[in-house]
Amino acid sequence: VYKRQEGYSGGGETMSRVMGMQPELYTAYLQCSSQWDGAYDKVVNSRTPVYFVIGEKDEYYGSEPSRKAYNELHSLYRQQGLSDSDIDKLLVLDIKPTSYFTSKGITNQHGYGGSLFVRDESIMNWLFAKVR
């Protein structure tokens, strides 16, 4: 059984805490328009893939918290000796430019990010291609 999880906004904060406690319960985690509030070590030790997606000008969080979490996880993987290509299979940082939203008639990156991201074929392909 493959369990994939998505967390959007406050749900992403909550899900990051779950990932920080028991990431082995999930095949992969997609964090949308949120920030990471959980621990990092167990995620790295379990090798559970994580995909961060957020608008570059997200009105609620901004993109910096996602960048910070990605960099922290990336650093921990490097400390374990993983190559960049191995890390790229486990960790994605996808900061969408404003044009991603405006090309779809959207001006509110945070409020509409969740609905756009779950309809984005490349993001969903990443999520559903992950197996354990």
What residue spans do the PLM features occupy?
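Short glycine-enriched nucleophile-adjacent loop
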Residues: 12-23
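Alpha/beta-hydrolase-fold catalytic nucleophile elbow
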Residues: 6, 32-33, 53
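Gly/Ala-rich beta-loop-alpha elbow adjacent to hydrolase catalytic centers
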Residues: 7-11
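Short, small-residue-biased leader/transition segments that mark boundaries at the very start
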Residues: 1-2
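C-terminal catalytic histidine-bearing segment of alpha/beta-hydrolase fold enzymes
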Residues: 53, 59, 76-132
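A conserved short beta-strand
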Residues: 24-36
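Short, proline-enriched alpha-helix->beta-strand connector loops that line the catalytic pocket
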Residues: 44-50
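Short alpha-helix in the alpha/beta-hydrolase fold that links the catalytic acid
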Residues: 61-79
